[in-house]
Amino acid sequence: MLFRSLACEPLKNKKKPRVLVGGLGMGFTLKAAIDTLSAGAEVVVAELNPIVVKWCRGPIACLTGGVVDDPRVKVVVADVAAVIRRAALPGRGNRFDAIILDLYEGPYEGDRGRGAYLYGDAAIERSCAALKAGGVFAVWSEEPDKAFEKRLKAARFSVNRQRPGRGGRHAVYIARKTPGPQARES
């Protein structure tokens, strides 16, 4: 089963799931989410590059059936970390049932590297705060990363690592927000 399907599978029976997809790319992750989720779903896609959005609405729209124009989809040209930060603010009613990060750079950068703003301790805690109870935090990674798994568990996620596809080189983390007080919010 592909990462895209694994990420939304826990939400397939939810009537109105709210999902954040980090990165549009060619639209395949978005397409899989839309195909898995109910008609009442809302999928917010955060894409940094407006040209990518233009391509997905134009020359490569046929690859995904024009999924970016599905009425359940809202595309924002923004950094996914900023969208997560806003959703994590106390008192906000815009938390997500799932956050899916299918980005070029995965968590292998560690807590202090370039990816810390998405995969470091504080970022993971923000993602947890941006999720509803039982929410899913799904992350694609170039390879397994034990330190990332440890950071997920420290933020009170239950973690399921999969190795989908041929060869099993890449890792997919499906982390569920567990009940109870979460780690400190930043």
Describe the predicted segments one by one.
Residues 173-186:
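C-terminal lobe and adjacent flexible extensions of AdoMet/dcAdoMet transferase-like proteins
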Residues 4-131, 139-142, 155, 160-168, ...:
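The AdoMet/dcAdoMet-binding core of the Class I SAM-like
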Residues 135:
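Glycine-centered, phosphate/nucleic-acid-interacting loop/turn motifs that mediate DNA/RNA or nucleotide
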Residues 1:
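S-adenosyl-L-methionine
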Residues 147:
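Conserved active-site alpha-helix within GNAT-family acetyltransferase domains
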